[in-house]
């Protein structure tokens, strides 16, 4: 329940989400006193939703300035660690965090691992367009991306879009400074070669930023 604005934002947002989505149950991980204080500001909502959320008290939280390595070694009682751990224990189906991104990635890899053939996770965002949407990744989980990593990102994104949108073979493209095959740098060329040869990827080629929309 951390992030830039903390429970003052996440609690009311969660309660509104519960109100609008009747099939959802939410587990809150964080400081019990702070969470309950915010919940009491919304008595009408809380009264109707009391059976659809649960609060788990956590003794610590991961700060926004904390190094991921420190979080891995010292923050096993933090709200972030316990929330991710609940996925590993199959208590919850998804985890939403507004906290330290580096720590989130490190703890997720430690607790959940990666799917077969994938070495690193990526941050993905949905971008609306005139007809449908585009998913863009990686958006900050990795500073430097090799051709192999970019190929893995394409595999992850393709699989995710297939599951979320029920599309058998979603199209995949690599964002570049031009659509020509000789544009960009060596790692982009390597990624393009791997994606083109992969039967699990419906690879279209290079695209420019304007094509995202």
Which residues does each predicted region cover?
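N-terminal phosphate-binding or glycine-rich loops at protein starts, especially the Walker A/P-loop
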Residues: 1-37
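Short glycine-rich anion-binding loops that position phosphate/pyrophosphate groups of nucleotides
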Residues: 1-2, 60-61, 100-102, 110, ...
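Short, acidic/small-residue loops that bind anionic groups at enzyme active sites
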Residues: 94, 105-140, 197-207
């Amino acid at each position: 329940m951390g992030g830039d604005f903390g429970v003052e934002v996440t609690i009311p947002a969660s309660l509104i989400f519960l109100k609008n989505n009747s099939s959802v149950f939410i587990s809150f991980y964080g400081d019990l006193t702070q969470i309950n204080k915010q919940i009491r500001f919304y008595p009408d909502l809380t009264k109707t939703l009391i059976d659809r959320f649960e609060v788990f008290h956590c003794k610590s939280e991961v700060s926004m300035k904390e190094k991921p390595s420190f979080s891995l070694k010292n923050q096993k009682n933090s709200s972030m660690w316990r929330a991710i751990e609940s996925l590993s224990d199959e208590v919850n189906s998804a985890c939403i965090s507004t906290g330290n991104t580096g720590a989130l990635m490190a703890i997720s890899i430690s607790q959940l691992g990666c799917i077969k053939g994938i070495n690193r996770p990526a941050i993905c965002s949905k971008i609306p367009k005139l007809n449908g949407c585009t998913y863009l990744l990686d958006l900050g989980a990795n500073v430097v991306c090799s051709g192999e990593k970019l190929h893995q990102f394409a595999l992850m994104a393709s699989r995710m879009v297939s599951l979320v949108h029920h599309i058998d073979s979603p199209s995949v493209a690599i964002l570049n400074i031009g659509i020509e095959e000789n544009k960009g740098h060596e790692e982009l060329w390597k990624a393009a070669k791997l994606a083109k040869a992969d039967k699990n990827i419906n690879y279209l080629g290079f695209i420019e930023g304007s094509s995202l929309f």
